[in-house]
Amino acid sequence: MLVAADQLDTRLYGPPVRPNLPPGFGTRYTWKTSKSTADRSRRSIYIHAKRNLPYPLLRVFDQPDMHESCARRPQTTIAPQALVLLNSELVLDLSRGVVKRIQDATYSKNIPARVRHAWLTVLGREPQKDELAGGIQFLAEQSTRSEAKDEVTRANDALLDLCHVLINTNEFLYID
């Protein structure tokens, strides 16, 4: 997701990253959030590890138990994973990063070009004819659902929804 949003910080080494924790974690065992957005764009291997407070996003996606060694990690596909990807503010922010890349690369009124660029950016391939048609139709329908007053904002809201959907596809999440 960080690569698709063009936000991955590839620096090696350095201090651990302390991402935002969801509300409701209290204050006793939490950590002070990293201030730099660049720090929050580093690989998950740099996320601060606290045995009694695993990072919730990683926990949902099979983070190993930090109390004992594990020779092999299980792979699961469970409903909370899909819910996190659909509802996480982090995933939505990364979708906004993808939208910015598309806006920087395409003319806003060229809808087919925006759909093609979304597919290339998120999935790494051109959309097939039916996918292109579906993407164009999706943008048209979503822009009418937006509560924004001006046409450009409605179009950008629809593009954000498309990018969010593409990030949630099996093709993006799983390597064949």
Please identify what each model-predicted range represents.
Residues L2-V122, E126, L166-D176:
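An acidic, gly/pro-interrupted, aromatic-rich
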